[in-house]
Design a protein with these regions (language model features):
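Terminal targeting/leader modules
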Residues: 77-81
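Short helix-to-coil transition segments within interhelical loops
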Residues: 82-88
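Alpha-helix N-cap/helix-start motif at helix boundaries, enriched for small hydrophobics
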Residues: 90-92
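Hydrophobic alpha-helical transmembrane segments of membrane proteins
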Residues: 1-76, 94-237
Length: 237
């Protein structure tokens, strides 16, 4: 193993020690919670709960990434980073490796959920693969935006801004959909929805959407890493 990778893994292990400082049992609990809840809801014909469960799941996996930042800012825990024989750039790389680990845990949870829905014969099992891919993309874009902010500002400010932005977007979406439903004739809405469904069923679009999704997620992570390095290198520990 080359020195660079050894240095990054040392920083990654330190971050993982922070995340698991209260115990490691929450890891399998977090991974299994979504499959159990969604599969149980599907078996009871309560598929409407799925959206709320996955919204909570994204929040949990965002907290995994936020926890090392909280640990560092409480009791001046960040001073240890100045003593660790790892360069700051490698410390950031270790933090992004933790980001990818949390994304991997979310992916495992999605795959288990898909399997559970298929076993109980849930109506949404056929298209859940696309939902899981979209969920992964949203998570990667979200943490790509949050990570540089957590290097630049306090975790309290980032958490507050995050909640404000999410609530604003939710109210905007609900208000927009309500306005569209009230102002646009029903026949026009039916034609538009039929067009969207036909577009979603077009198998030719799947490779194109996959390439766009992978490219945008990779670009977001690359830009996020560069910005995080710049903020952290300029930060006084």
């Amino acid at each position: 193993m080359n020195p660079t990778m050894r240095s990054v893994l040392r920083a990654y292990r330190m971050d993982w020690q922070m995340v698991s400082s209260q115990g490691w049992i929450w890891v399998p609990a977090a991974v299994l919670a979504v499959p159990v809840l969604v599969t149980a809801g599907a078996a009871a014909h309560m598929e409407a709960l799925t959206g709320g469960v996955f919204g909570a799941a994204i929040y949990i996996y965002v907290l995994i990434l936020m926890y090392p930042f909280m640990y560092e800012q409480q009791g001046h825990g960040g001073w240890m980073n100045g003593l660790m024989p790892v360069s700051r750039r490698h410390q950031v790389a270790g933090r992004y490796l933790l980001l990818l680990t949390s994304a991997g845990l979310l992916l495992v949870s999605c795959l288990l959920t898909w399997t559970g829905m298929a076993i109980v014969g849930a109506a949404g099992a056929g298209y859940f693969g696309g939902v899981a891919v979209a969920l992964m993309w949203v998570y990667l874009i979200m943490v790509s935006l949050l990570c540089p902010l957590m290097y630049r500002f306090s975790i309290q400010k980032v958490g507050l801004w995050f909640m404000v932005v999410v609530l604003t977007l939710c109210f905007a979406v609900v208000g927009g959909l309500t306005a569209v439903a009230a102002l646009v004739p029903e026949t026009v809405l039916d034609r538009a929805l039929s067009g969207v469904v036909a577009l979603a069923d077009n198998m030719m679009l799947i490779p194109i959407l996959a390439v766009i999704g992978i490219a945008t997620a990779a670009l977001a992570l690359a830009v996020s890493f560069r910005v995080s390095c710049r903020f952290y290198l300029a930060k006084e520990l």
